[in-house]
Amino acid sequence: MCSTGEEILAKSTQGATFLMMGQLFGKLVTFVLHNVLVRFLSPRIFGITSFLDFLSSTVLFFSREAIRLATLRIKTGGDGGRGGEMSAELQTAVNFANIPMCIGAPLAVVLAVWQYSNLNSYFTQLPFFSWSIYLVLLSILAELASEPLYVVNQFMLNYRKRSQFEGAAVAASCLVNFAVIYWYENWVNGRGETVHDSYKQEGIAVLAFALGKVARAMTLLALYYVDYVRHLAHEKLFSLSLTKVRVPGSVYTAYFDSDVLQHFKKVYFQLCFKHLLTEGDKLIINSLCTVEEQGIYSLLSNYGSLITRMVFAPIEESLLLFLTRLLSDKTQQNLHICMRVLVNLVKFYLYLALVIVIFGPTNSSFLLKFLIGSKWSSTSVLETIRVYCFYLPFLSMNGILEAFFASVASGDEILRHSYLMMLLSGVFLLNCWVFLAHFNLSLEGLIFSNIINMTLRIIYCSNYIRGFYKRLFADSKQTSLSSSFAGLKKILLLCIVVAYVDWSIIGYVQNIRQLLVNILLSVTLVLAMAYNERKLLLEFIKKSKPVPVKEN
């Protein structure tokens, strides 16, 4: 276990690297499989698999996300030992980690029945569709069963194991998904050259997706359990079932820490509205868009946010884990460390956002042409992805700022943020109605609504962080955040020049030569950014080196 702020920072820096590697492996495997399948399947099938994925992710989010955040607030002894305190902390975490199954099992059934009744009859009558629903429910239960062991490894900051296990689970999912479709196309449906039964083909594709979900969940559960038996069970630090723990400073025992339980309730309320805003676009397209448009948006989410999920998501999650563990003891030193980390990460995000905004819209359509088959040529996906590129920086910046807010905010501040989420939910729905129903902007209108939503959330978190910074440095001459970003002015000017030159000479990329010119320009810009932040990069390299911290 880590005890000092610098040790937690060092391990979290390594953890971000492990999570990025795991995400990179998982996304590369998924990417290759996606490019094979997209040439066989229609936008309609991607629409229904997107719905099943939404069903699974929604149940898992509402079941476990608040618990994962709340257990990070369990106060540690700080000595890094393995005595009674360590055992009590882990048992408390495991007790909380048993709650997701109690929430998820009934929620999965209710949500599946409700959504099933609202589906188009075309899908409900597909071969194997009912079996696919049952398999998705099974995958949810299997994944929730692994939650106690996930929480234990999260509490110990065991990033390496998690990235290894999740990488293996993703690989298993993709292999099963591909194997089922490949088997059907080559052994049942001819050689894949002629579609003899397109209706059954679509049913098989949905079934393959569901089987992939089950393979992922079962692999994850098996790996966590085997690791527990091999490395933790013999030490008897905790039980996987509910066990009472002695309340600190008291002779009484309880299953749940009262402070953590109160924080869980407030975080859960906030996450309900946060998820509605984060996943609200999927709810909207299910109501206001055609099945083909749902498939297009699913494709955009998969291709358009590759960088976001491979780079930004691991950093955001590592920051959240790092800050929550670090600030379980809110010393002045720890507060200064967390502020320094945030400023450096915001700089990195701003640099990457500039690169995406400059080169994303001009290159994305050309690159996407090589990745999709003829079944998508008649859709608007090539035009829509250009607009989607402008949304990615807002999505990413909001993620890092809200991760900081969730880590440092008190229970009452989180509750106030929940009320804001409630208000923004109404604003989001209003914007969607205006853009989609009134102006008929289709998917572009949905993206504009998301940009407005993310902008408002960024403004709120930025104001909170600005106040937090002023209070933290009240006794110092440095009371403004702007001085930390003074070096960005030169890079911003360079970005404007590069964007003007790129658009004036090339515009939208149409051939390989123009693509190579854009790559050269982007590399030059990135090198200029790296030179501008050379001291920060050297510090990051030092932090990424292995530290003598024992990992379980």
Swiss-Prot record:
Where, per UniProt, does this protein localize? Endoplasmic reticulum membrane
What does the entry give for GO biological process? Answer: dolichol-linked oligosaccharide biosynthetic process; glycolipid translocation; protein N-linked glycosylation
Write down the InterPro entries for this protein, in alphabetical order: RFT1
Q: Keywords of this protein's UniProt record, alphabetized? A: Endoplasmic reticulum, Membrane, Sugar transport, Transmembrane, Transmembrane helix, Transport
Q: Name one GO cellular component term.
A: endoplasmic reticulum membrane
What are the TM regions of this chain, as residue ranges?
A: 18-38, 42-62, 94-114, 126-146, 168-188, 203-223, 341-361, 389-409, 419-439, 491-511, 512-532
Instruction: Provide a Gene Ontology MF annotation, just one.
Output: flippase activity
What is known about what this protein does?
Answer: Intramembrane glycolipid transporter that operates in the biosynthetic pathway of dolichol-linked oligosaccharides, the glycan precursors employed in protein asparagine (N)-glycosylation. The sequential addition of sugars to dolichol pyrophosphate produces dolichol-linked oligosaccharides containing fourteen sugars, including two GlcNAcs, nine mannoses and three glucoses. Once assembled, the oligosaccharide is transferred from the lipid to nascent proteins by oligosaccharyltransferases.
Record family assignment? Belongs to the RFT1 family.
* Annotated protein name in UniProt: Man(5)GlcNAc(2)-PP-dolichol translocation protein RFT1
Which organism does this record belong to?
Answer: Eremothecium gossypii (strain ATCC 10895 / CBS 109.51 / FGSC 9923 / NRRL Y-1056) (Yeast)
